[in-house]
């Protein structure tokens, strides 16, 4: 059976109406982490490498396409460059299927990120700050960063609260 453009558009429209976001279909299996695990993704995902989750070490995160955001933030006086994989690329790698993403930090902070944030603002899961690996004192080793300077509507406490530092876990719901 041939899939025509109209069928694909129809499928995409139905996903949009239900609020469900489907992030990629990756045929290549996700390898197991060889180093310390920096990020775990669980929930509605199609790719797993450890039990019911997808775990990433530094090398696995670095193998994903690099994204950069240069922006100011409430925690820094000057514009800084945050680099690492985009949240979207991680969700694509694990074949995430959900409309809401719960981010959990090392200090037990949790916040939900709507799918619209990912498509509209393309936040980055930064491993590097101004070219240097982020340490715990830099709010690392992982920090979800939004392009605050590129979108003035992000410059408020709602979005500042979504910039999760010491990110460890994403639950796809």
Predicted regions located by residue number:
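Bacterial N-terminal signal peptides that target proteins for export
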Residues: 2-15
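Sec/Tat signal peptide C-region and signal peptidase I cleavage site
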Residues: 23-27
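N-terminal intrinsically disordered, low-complexity segments enriched in P/E/S/T
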Residues: 28-173
């Amino acid at each position: 059976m041939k899939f025509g453009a109209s069928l694909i558009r129809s499928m995409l429209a139905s996903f949009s109406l239900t609020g469900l976001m489907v992030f990629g279909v990756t045929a290549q299996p996700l390898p197991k982490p060889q180093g310390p695990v920096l990020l775990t993704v669980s929930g509605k995902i199609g790719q797993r490498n450890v039990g019911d989750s997808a775990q990433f070490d530094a090398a696995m995160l670095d193998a994903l396409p690099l994204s950069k955001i240069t922006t100011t933030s409430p925690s820094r006086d000057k514009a800084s460059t945050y680099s690492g994989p985009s949240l979207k690329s991680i969700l694509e790698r694990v074949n995430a299927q959900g409309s809401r993403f719960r981010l959990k930090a090392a200090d037990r902070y949790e916040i939900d990120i709507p799918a619209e944030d990912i498509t509209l603002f393309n936040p980055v899961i930064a491993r590097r700050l101004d070219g240097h690996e982020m340490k715990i004192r830099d709010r690392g080793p992982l920090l979800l960063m939004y392009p605050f300077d590129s979108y003035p509507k992000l410059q408020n406490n709602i979005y500042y609260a979504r910039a999760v530092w010491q990110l460890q876990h994403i639950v796809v719901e």
